UniProtKB/Swiss-Prot annotation:
GO terms for cellular component: cytoplasm. Pfam families: MTS (PF05175). It comes from Edwardsiella ictaluri (strain 93-146). One of its GO terms (biological process) is tRNA processing. This is tRNA1(Val) (adenine(37)-N6)-methyltransferase.
């Protein structure tokens, strides 16, 4: 992620400072990273969103980005209590405390008890299949799909979505095709796909996906984070300039 120049002002060290809000993440197993910032900046908003849901919210960075970009009520759902508490603290410290709410429970429990339907659902979901043990149970919950596999995410997102709702995800490239295929099973039609590379001469490492309940022509493109001189590319800068402090 972009770092401040050496002569820049001193910033808090327990989180990440963006242009309009600060995200404390020292009590969250998964820290603020480029993937969430990309997803929150990349996805196109229609402008009429009333309710937005961030699944696996963690520190709340995606929910906060949605609050900055819209006038919607934004809910986060996070199963890990420590992360959920810090996410709620971040919400309360933001410019939009009345529009942000964190729910501390599993997506399965949230979906079963939620009477609301969402215009937009966003998620940077767990991405590793269960394997090598993590240092803590909280980190395993944040990283491994056994706590929330992609099929369950797609199914519950469909249950929580409006009839014309949309779902935006960021995934490792190796998981993207499977999620697109599984999405069709749950009525999610791919609308937009962006392949993300560190640089033009590097392999694709992440995929940004936008699904809708209503089918439409698929838009596909590629995003290079850095240019040939290893500086942040103009496209990446323009996409994230409302958030990154030093763009």
């Amino acid at each position: 992620m972009p770092h401040p120049p050496s002569a820049a002002l001193s910033l808090p060290r327990n989180g990440f400072t963006l242009k309009r809000f600060f995200v404390a993440h020292d009590r969250c197993e998964m820290k603020v990273g480029t993937d969430s910032i990309m997803l929150g900046a990349w996805l196109p908003l229609r402008g009429d969103e009333r309710h937005i849901l961030d699944i696996g919210s963690g520190s709340g960075v995606l929910a906060l980005m949605m609050a900055q970009r819209s006038t919607a009520q934004v809910d986060g759902v996070e199963i890990e209590p420590g992360a959920a508490t810090q996410g709620q603290e971040n919400f309360l410290a933001s410019p939009w405390p009345t529009r942000l709410t964190m729910h501390t429970l599993s997506l399965q429990a949230f979906s079963a008890g939620c009477g609301r339907r969402y215009d937009l659902i966003v998620s940077n979901p767990p991405y590793f299949a269960p394997g090598v043990a993590c240092r803590t149970a909280a980190r395993a919950t944040a990283r491994y799909t056994d706590s929330l596999d992609h099929a369950a995410l797609l199914r519950h997102a469909a249950e929580l979505s409006c009839e014309d709702g949309r779902l935006a995800l960021v995934l490792p490239v190796e998981a993207a095709e499977s999620v697109v295929s599984k999405g069709m099973t749950h009525g999610w039609h791919l609308l937009r796909r962006t392949a993300v590379r560190d640089r033009a001469d590097k392999p694709v490492r992440r995929t940004l996906l936008l699904f809708g309940r209503i089918p439409a022509a698929v838009q596909s493109n590629t995003l290079d984070i850095r240019d040939d001189s290893s500086e942040y590319s103009c496209i990446f800068r323009n996409m994230t300039k409302d958030f990154y402090l030093f763009f």
